[in-house]
Amino acid sequence: MTKLQLKYRELKIISVIAASENISHAATVLGIAQANVSKYLADFESKVGLKVFDRTTRQLMLTPFGTALLPYINDMLDRNEQLNNFIADYKHEKRGRVTIYAPTGIITYLSKHVIDKIKDIGDITLSLKTCNLERNAFYEGVEFPDDCDVLISYAPPKDESLVASFITQYAVTAYASQRYLEKHPISRPDELEHHSCILIDSMMIDDANIWRFNVAGSKEVRDYRVKGNYVCDNTQSALELARNHLGIVFAPDKSVQSDLQDGTLVPCFQQPYEWWLDLVAIFRKREYQPWRVQYVLDEMLREIRHQLAQSQQLRPEQAAESED
């Protein structure tokens, strides 16, 4: 039996047509003329002697053969991409995809202040994805998504084989609007049980949160069970509810700087009742990382630590340790 000489472009065209179910859309995605797309498809079907798509309907539909064939085509395309990425990494070329996950607020910070400082990324595609902490992540560790290269998180990784590189510490405490506090005064964390608290899903235990505070003037940490009518899976949404006078929010001090300046939110306690969280970058060990990931990771962490040192959010000795 004569072996078929299958071309990469033919396989790519079939994959894109299957995803879009439209030759015109496929031509736009691929950047080639619609007539050429049709010709490549016809040549492939003639070569194998079987129809891949059914053209009797308004949309292109896969035939039974096409349905069975598509997984093999996509697998071959993926392997080709992996091979190209391997060669590029070996040659230290800047190409391929790097996927970064982080909570909503951190993704916003990276987009505003960090990514544009990584000037020379060549043909690397940076994919920024939101990953708010899941329930119990603070207590059990955070999951590392399958397609993730770097995860920036307030929680340690559940998988202990991953690296968690310290970036900085954030103080987390309780804030509310002035209107809320005028109606519902509070002075100590043990009074939180009598208040409407805006809960964070990743800190849920049953129908409540456990908020932690250092005892003022000491390193002792105490847990306080709080409840409320609202649950959010990210701090940004919780802050919006607090700005609308709906309760007390537990948030990093760096997330509320503008609110404190304009008086939208104020601290609930006069004494420094706080919980310090480590912000970490989680990634695979470097021997298992593609070079492009190492490059983006190093550039990103260097810029973050530079900004932290400049703003004196990070003590000089911590900044030095982090660079080692």
Swiss-Prot record:
Give yes or no: UniProt keyword Transcription regulation: yes
Q: Which GO terms describe its cellular component?
A: cytosol
This protein's record includes keyword DNA-binding: yes
A Pfam short name: HTH_1
Q: Which GO terms describe its biological process?
A: regulation of DNA-templated transcription
Keywords assigned: DNA-binding, Transcription, Transcription regulation
Describe the location of the HTH lysR-type domain by residue ranges: 6-63
**Residue ranges the UniProt entry marks as DNA-binding:** 23-42
Task: Tell me the GO molecular function terms.
Answer: DNA-binding transcription factor activity; sequence-specific DNA binding
Give the PANTHER family listed for this entry: HTH-TYPE TRANSCRIPTIONAL REGULATOR YBHD (PTHR30419), LYSR FAMILY TRANSCRIPTIONAL REGULATOR (PTHR30419:SF14)
Q: Which family does the entry's similarity section mention?
A: Belongs to the LysR transcriptional regulatory family.
What name has this protein been given in UniProt?
Uncharacterized HTH-type transcriptional regulator YiaU
- Taxonomic lineage: Bacteria, Pseudomonadati, Pseudomonadota, Gammaproteobacteria, Enterobacterales
